[in-house]
Amino acid sequence: MAIVAQGVSTILTTFQKTFKGLLPLIILVAYTLLGAWIFWMIEGENEREMLIEQQKERDELIRRTVYKINQLQIKRQRRLMTAEEEYNRTAKVLTTFQETLGIVPADMDKDIHWTFLGSIFYCMTVYTTIGYGNIVPGTGWGRFATILYAFIGIPLTVLSLYCLGSLFAKGCKMLWRFFLKSTRVVSKDLSNKISEAADNIEEGTTAITPSAEKTENNDDDLLSFPISGLLLITVIWVIFCAVLFTFLEEWDFGTSLYFTLISFTTIGFGDILPSDYDFMPIVGVLLLIGLSLVSTVMTLIQQQIEALASGMKDNIDQEYARALNEAREDGEVDEHVDPEEDPENNKKSFDAVISRMNWSKRGLYYLLPDSQKKELAKQSEKKMGRKSIKIQTDNDLLETLIREEILKAELNNEMHKYTAPRSSHQPKLVYSDVREKEVPIEVVRVEHFNHGNEDYLEHDI
């Protein structure tokens, strides 16, 4: 029972996390249906009335035109044909002329755009910012509703695309881990982790917990996933959509591919459009998935560039250390120059070090952002002045420790352990074993010893 309960709990937890991740997408779907109903109610009847009115105007125009032409023909033919025959012939000529111009009678089944399915497609073109232009509001209220709908829908779409991209990224990481496991590919930093764990055990420190390692690996898995694989998936999806459109719209493959790419990049010229509005929701779903793929790929490319820049900085820093040593050996860099006192000389030294790097490392350096270049220059200043600062700090610290050691010996009456007998005219030398070194200094206080009262003046040697 415990195993069953644990399994049910795991399933519920997974479902809860998945539902939480899909919640913005569910809200977006509901928002789409709500917007479709609103625009359908606002624009649907208006469009129908406009089409009916246009058809009436066309019919009236044709009737008047035919009548006038008929009257003219009657007068010209001098009653060689009946009026009905002349009317029919003239109407036929005008109808042919009208069809040649592309003016055809309105089809209430095909020419209606503001159906519920068409309204869904319109909502998708609004909040994805594609905007083909084939469906537009014709009323003031419709335009006002479009503006409000876009203000809410566009941020919601961005959030939904982010959630879809995150789910897609998780799927990529699962496939990548499965690939590594099935091919028994060992991570390149496994040996480093083993060494670190061994060092931690030897030093008595706490090793990294499996949960911490799992969290770190989950964060790095997506960056380690080859970006070429994601690009390949995106290309496959684009080709799939293009092939699907060739069957839905009877387009050639070039036209379908053009429409797909124009849509996925949210350019949306509107010159190529689906003709069957019953398939509009399917087109919208395909475009939404394509946009999420494009968004994911662009985000991952940015993360890959940032990771590459970080790796470049580490490589350049190592190369800098090697080039700095070579420059110092050749005398191009002065070891004792304080960069704060002579920044101009430090700049020349830094340029000399950069010039000694190989062309690939030097190229990576020039590709770094300005902020990281400045950081590397600051590291250069620290390295250039590190030796003199280190020597200065060591001397001061050593002197302080020696004086503390002498004071302790004085308080414990153990000065005889550190003193060496000298003649009366020679200064008394005191030795300290601080840091396993014997550093002589002259006594600066008045010392009293068992063999007599003698005064000694001290000063540093």
UniProtKB/Swiss-Prot annotation:
Could you tell me where this protein is found in the cell? Membrane
GO BP, one annotated term? locomotion
The UniProt entry, under Gene3D superfamilies, shows: 1.10.287.70
Q: In the UniProt record for this chain, what is stated about the effect of gene disruption?
A: Worms display uncoordinated movement and paralysis.
Location of the region described as Disordered in the Swiss-Prot/TrEMBL record: 328-347
* Tissue distribution of the protein: Expressed in body wall muscle.
Q: Spell out where the chain is glycosylated.
A: N88
Keyword Phosphoprotein annotated: no
> What residue ranges lie in the Cytoplasmic compartment?
1-21, 165-224, 302-461
Bilayer topology annotation: Multi-pass membrane protein
Per the annotation, which location comes first and is thus the protein's main one? membrane
The role this protein plays is: Outwardly rectifying potassium channel protein; activity is sharply augmented by increase in temperature.
Q: Which family does it belong to?
A: Belongs to the two pore domain potassium channel (TC 1.A.1.8) family.
Instruction: Give the protein name, as stated in the record.
Output: TWiK family of potassium channels protein 18
Tell me which species this is from.
Answer: Caenorhabditis elegans
What is the name of the gene encoding this protein? twk-18
